[in-house]
Amino acid sequence: MTASDPTSKPAASTPAQDLAARTRANQERFAAGIGSLDARELENLLMNATNLAGTYYPEDRDKSGFALYAMSEADRARPLAERVPPTPLRHYYGYRDGKYHDDLYLRGGFADIRTIRKVLADDGFDQMGERIMEFGCSGGRMMRHLEAEAAANEVWGVDLHSAAIHWAQAHLSPPFHFMTNTTAPHLPFEDNSFGLIFAGSVWTHIGELDDAWLLEMRRILRPGGRLYITISDENTLAEVARISPDHASNGHVAELDAATGMLSKDWVAFVTRTTPWLQRVIYRREAWLERIGRWMEVRHARPNAYGWQTGVLLAKRG
């Protein structure tokens, strides 16, 4: 028998073996009861795993599970549009000077809905009586201001974040309807189900599945229905750099440019960082509109319609 060479290096592991080893280590941590994964570790584990199924952000839980609760009497006494979710569910909306402000959160949602209503009115589209969906609703920051529409037809909110959906189900339903979706580009609705779908700052995070999700929106829209979404584009880059030069996203773009040289090339889109909440997707607006215009009619594109983002109104042909 030949002795092994003590100077030889072990064979390099494959990505699958590395993932399996990390998974076993995480399972052992849970089994030993020495602590759970923090949110960032859990996000990276879930979103970077190679699989064919969609994923979502689950409720925080320990070994015994988790519980859901009805809204408090204090919240029940408030008008529906003034019920504010816990700060972890607000995703920086209403955040200023190092803290969250309830009034800014509520006013911002109202202002964004007012913008959508104006865009639709300018396009000659009346959303009253239409079945409506907010894609990426979180705690209902915007759709809570559609009570009149909800009295006329169903208004749905869907999101990856199950805790936000559970909060909304307890505090905003009725009159609204909510469900948790996954990253897989499919929603459990029939073809031609909705007259209006809107999504604020969602296509800014989707990444490689953006076209698949756009086509899913087209599937569930009725012919003549409208899709209103917001995107980050070259105008967004310029506005962020001009107004907030110390914003972290400027550094993310510079880091990717240093690695790829993209800004000196004819780029059409790029993604900084990873995972749905962290990644940022930037489109060259005209190139993107030209491509998606083959699938849906482009009715309107307005820079700075949603903060620094460009609002885009699309219509399903037919």
Per-range role (PLM):
Residues 19-99:
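N-terminal, positively charged/glycine-rich alpha-helical extensions of SAM-dependent methyltransferases
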Residues 128-138, 228-257:
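Conserved class I S-adenosyl-L-methionine
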Residues 141-186:
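Class I SAM-dependent methyltransferase SAM/SAH-binding core
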Residues 206-216:
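A short, conserved alpha-helix within the catalytic core of class I
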